[in-house]
Amino acid sequence: MHCPICHHRAHVVYCAHCINTSPSLLLKLKLDLILLKDENKELNGKVEQILNEAMNYDQLDIKRMEKKKDPLMNSLMKLDVLRMKKNNNLIRHRIEQLNERIYSKRNHISELKVEIDNYKCYKVGTGTDKLIEQVEISDAKNKLAQVSKICESVRDYKLNLLNNWFVIQKLQDNFQIPFAIAFQPLISLKNFRVLPLAITNDSINIMWKYISFFSDILMIKLPYTNKICEQPMFEFSDSIQTVVQRLIKLIINILQICRHLKLVPSTPMDIPWLLDQYDVDGLFYNMVKRNKMKCRSVSLYWTFGMLYSMVLDNMNNPQRGHPARRTAPPPTVTGPHDRWYVVG
């Protein structure tokens, strides 16, 4: 091949046919190829050795490695050193940032401590007073709870003794007199006209005594008191109107005690409906046993005059009450002081 400018031969070019058919040309090129392969193998071995030594240079003798002075190994070592420096710089920068944050937080903590100390010095008096007051209130509440439990147990014990003393009991198979107190029948609107006046007065007196003791144990003040002086058994001469008035006052006191014991609601009640369901003896017995009673609510409270008229109407109505009581035989004619109604 000739140069187009100077026309000198630069390279010798042979065609493929001549190369394949000429033994001298083929042998020479094959020998050159073999030599190149051997040189490549030798260079590959050196490169691998240099790479291995460069990767494990920290485990080899540095002076011995420096004596070799291989360019590739030196370049790789420099590259590792640069990488290490870069990592060290990043770590150093991160450490500096963390130190700055730590210093800023320390300064903030010290400022907060100063403020807390100032606040404590300012609020130490009021804080101590509040703490002492809370402790005293807690102790007082605990003592009050203990005293309340003791008072309730003592009250229950006294009420049980009072019930045993007055022998309050529920009679079986007796529709006319279902309840008894101190071996006397409990008065109701249904048996008021059946019992003699002396028995009625004695029963009301006993119920008044029980109500008085009951209110003393509960330490409550009743709307009415029994101001009528007690007379001997055979010298009682109260009229029916006076007995009815005492009975109404007794009903009001019973309802007041039931409200205090939360047996009935404190709101206005439908007293006629309540008496129709329980009657006076049922109210008294449920109060003694502290049983809750069903009630109907109304908008106005009942007065003494309204109750007086209602009680008189109920006692004068012969069609009122339980069928067994309405069909009961008429009372036996007795004297004013006959005690045949005493129950046992």
Swiss-Prot record:
Keyword field: Autophagy, Coiled coil, Membrane, Protein transport, Transport, Vacuole
Short name of any one Pfam family annotated for the protein: ATG14
GO cellular component: phagophore assembly site membrane; protein-containing complex; vacuolar membrane
Parts forming coiled coils: 26-156
Broad class of the protein's primary localization: membrane
Top-level taxonomic group: Eukaryota
Subcellular localization(s) per the UniProt record: Preautophagosomal structure membrane; Vacuole membrane
Membrane topology per record: Peripheral membrane protein
Positions of the UniProt region annotated as Cysteine repeats: 3-18
GO BP term, pick one: protein transport
Stated role: Required for cytoplasm to vacuole transport (Cvt) and autophagy as a part of the autophagy-specific VPS34 PI3-kinase complex I. This complex is essential to recruit the ATG8-phosphatidylinositol conjugate and the ATG12-ATG5 conjugate to the pre-autophagosomal structure. ATG14 mediates the specific binding of the VPS34 PI3-kinase complex I to the preautophagosomal structure (PAS).
Domains (record comment): Coiled-Coils at the N-terminal half are essential for interaction with VPS30 and VPS34 and autophagy.
Subunit structure: Component of the autophagy-specific VPS34 PI3-kinase complex I composed of VPS15, VPS30, VPS34 and ATG14.
Family membership: Belongs to the ATG14 family.
Name under which the protein is recorded: Autophagy-related protein 14
Organism the protein comes from: Saccharomyces cerevisiae (strain YJM789)
